[in-house]
Amino acid sequence: MLKKLFLGIIHIYQRYISPMTPPTCRFYPTCSEYTREAIEVYGPFKGGYMGIRRILKCHPLHKGGFDPVPLKKDKHRH
C-alpha cells in the first residue's frame, strides 16, 4: 500500500509538475526516475531512503552523471 502511494506521488510529479520546470537534474536516470526504480526494486523504505540520498546529491557542486539503481544482490547465491 505504501509502495503504491509513493509511486503514485512520483507519477504525479513526473506527469504534471516536472514538465513545467526546466531540466536541472545532474544525473541519468533523473532523480525521480531513480527513486521510482529504487522503490520498485527495494520497497518503499529502503528505496525511498535511496531516493532521498540521491536527491540530496543533486546540486551544482556534484558532477552528476550515470548513476543507475544498484542491482539487488541475490542472498541465495554463493
UniProtKB/Swiss-Prot annotation:
Belongs to the UPF0161 family. Keywords: Cell membrane, Membrane. One of its GO terms (cellular component) is plasma membrane. It comes from Staphylococcus haemolyticus (strain JCSC1435). This is Putative membrane protein insertion efficiency factor. It is found in: Cell membrane. Could be involved in insertion of integral membrane proteins into the membrane. HAMAP family: UPF0161_YidD (MF_00386). The keyword Membrane applies.
